[in-house]
Amino acid sequence: MSVKTHLPSAPSDTSSRSRCFWLRLQAKAFLVLGMRSKAHAVFQDILEIHPQDVLALNSLGFNELNDRHLVQALGFFERALVLTPTLANAHFNVGFVCEELGRSQEAEHAFRAAIQIDEKMDRAWYGLGLVLVRQRRFEESLVAFKRNTELQSMSPYAWYQMARVHMEMQAPEKALEVIRHLNGFEPKVAAQLVRETGLNLDRPV
């Protein structure tokens, strides 16, 4: 008489991990194909299986952000931050959405946390500068924007903001210095600032 042997079934947690693995591959394929809504649905399925899946949380957060569903995006990013508190990007994502929502103090806290982890995160310095401007803390904002320009010297964004801040501080000469610097590598942005500020590049310093 033959004896039938039965292999033990895989533990449920192993099955869940395997299913999440294949679902991630499927979601990434949908993203590559530009099928964001289908990828969104797959990431939701992943969270039902594994609520602490950071990739799914961040992906859903970015999807909501792209659709301008800011509160929903913040919810996903905050959940991801709880799971990855030592990652600068996790703090930055929360700060970015808070800044978009006009929640300046929360955004400032998140950007500063990101910088504390990664002092060279240029976009966190830029975000910090923006929220400090919103709070009319102009001197501090200039420090943040200056650090951004040290990390990204050829990016015009912080230079642009610095010129605007100098104008807010009634310092047109300093604004003009920034505009002249910008004119050397981003003449279109410099021209925009000339129109906005009414300053003349030919004006003597």
Predicted regions and their residues:
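Structural marker of alpha-solenoid helical repeat scaffolds
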Residues: S15, I49, L83, I117, ...
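TPR/TPR-like alpha-solenoid helical repeat scaffolds
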Residues: Y160-Q170, V189-V205
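Structural signature of tandem alpha-helical TPR/SEL1-like repeats
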Residues: S2-P8, V32-D45, N66-R79, E100-A113, ...
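Helix-start (N-cap) detector for alpha-helical repeat units in TPR-like alpha-solenoids
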Residues: C20, V54-L55, A88-N89, D122-R123, ...
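Alpha-helical segment of the N-proximal tetratricopeptide repeat
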Residues: S15-L55, S59-H69
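TPR/TPR-like alpha-solenoid repeats
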Residues: A29, N63, V97, V131, ...
